[in-house]
Amino acid sequence: MILECGCPEHYPDWHNQDIDLGGQCAHILPIPMLAHMPMSYDSYLHKQREEIGLLELKERWPGMALMATGAFRGKLIRLIENSTSPSRRIEYLPRPFQLRGWLHPGDIGSIRTPVHEMQLDLLDLGRTPQELYLSYITCTRCYEQRGGHKTLLLRRWVDSPTLKKRVKPLA
């Protein structure tokens, strides 16, 4: 269920876990960015929610959107139930699509340290970090009622045999 402000009421418990979303059906909406900062983020979230509603698709976690940033273009990803919709925005995520999750009790201004720690943990396990996805669990309207700012950080990774050889096993 989606709250009145647009935030997800329920979200997956992916804190400090590895998740494989490979083969999951997703609605992917490209969004404009400027220096990795989304432009009109709320309006694109609303547009994506409206498109999913018009297509009569069912989200796995209603209201939860993953945002991937880029210098000038990013994307919003919402996981949906398997669908045979002819929409050009419905795609299946590639296999493998390994992610390391981290529930950060803060907003975008304080994610530097947890992202760095997550990256070091992945490197210690012989995994190469790839792109970073953000999912805002709370917004500026509901964070006080829901226990403060919460941001789900998801770092995509791939196994690296070369890196595994270089990393000494922890005893």
Which residues make up each language-model segment?
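A solvent-exposed interaction/effector surface
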Residues: M1-A171
